């Protein structure tokens, strides 16, 4: 389970402003995305390991007669597991015999990849994360027999059960001990390891598996089962961002990383990799700022992103980040209300997905100064890949000429609306670019675009 936030589109959107003959569709979103819950829910991956948990067969005891060869993760991950997954979910085993369960699972899985997968799916669908024990700090007996009997476990129990079933089904496997960026993990903390996961050999090559993080999330101190296939045969270059093994050979990477490097990286989740996002200009979790910061990400066309600035786990709705897309990149511009330490939370989803935005990436930004506030953007801005050239500050000089320049693909017309006077001023169109000098009044100013024939305009940007 990893740090993860979900947002939903706000049902009670800001009411539209109607002017005779014209309808403005106002849908306020942070950088083009509306959220149902401004505070949101934090879904967490817990630390849940102590040496006293008695791991039954960890990598310290693993005797290898051959070199550790990393597997072809793409080949194993992209296998056709639809039938195996369906069978694993249908097995309603109520007993407490490891051998009996292994025999049942083996009936449906013939190859080593199928065996590794059916164990993963069965455990993630049948073992519940023991939140109560975690919160008490007393994790109890993590032996595979007890875990199977009680159907509750923290990470060591998940890892032990996976290991025991793998062994009984003829797979070479072990428990990996290390550090995971879950709840309470302190960067730079040199204390004992806090997590356990598995390594398994498939066709003479090794793969990494975390059934705990694949089982679900914890929300408001309640476990929510939420199967995540990402943590089955996770590519080592992705898992290293969140999992650091004590024995570095189980990074399964050609280059070995130090824990100091692990601690320095941003917090990224499975959503980050699922949506094909890549870091461009900030590879460290901690960023220093002088009032305004830009984070640049490589984002595929099919991925939508949004962002939120937080302080002390609370959203700062007065300073919404500005996200602009250009040349396959998303530029996230953040301004800070005052000097201090902040969290920049980035969320993503596939454009075709009607579900929530999920937490993809986090940075900790420390600013030594107050930043100039930036304009507020609306849903239509992001949906149409608009790009604002000027002005890029939220507070405009009153009763003065202001140069407006904005690129809005697909727009038939763009206007500047002075909400204090009700004046509408069209901008000059040149291809997808709209520009012009407009005298602004003393109230809010809105940039709105028309995308269909008729008199309907949608809000793009708002100034104070």
Regions found by a protein language model. Name each.
Residues 58-154, 160-164, 169:
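Secondary-structure boundary elements
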Residues 32-47:
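Hydrophobic single-pass membrane-insertion segments
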Residues 1-16:
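N-terminal Lys/Arg-rich, disordered targeting/topogenic segments
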Residues 47-61:
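Short extracytoplasmic/periplasmic juxtamembrane "stem" segments immediately C-terminal to an N-terminal membrane anchor
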Residues 20-21, 218-464:
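Alpha-helical and coiled-coil interaction segments, frequently adjacent to or embedded
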Residues 20-36:
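Hydrophobic membrane-insertion alpha-helices, especially the h-region
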Residues 98, 106, 117, 216, ...:
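Cytosolic catalytic domains that perform sulfur/thiol-centered chemistry
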Residues 121, 160-239:
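Hydrophobic/aromatic-rich core segments of domains that either
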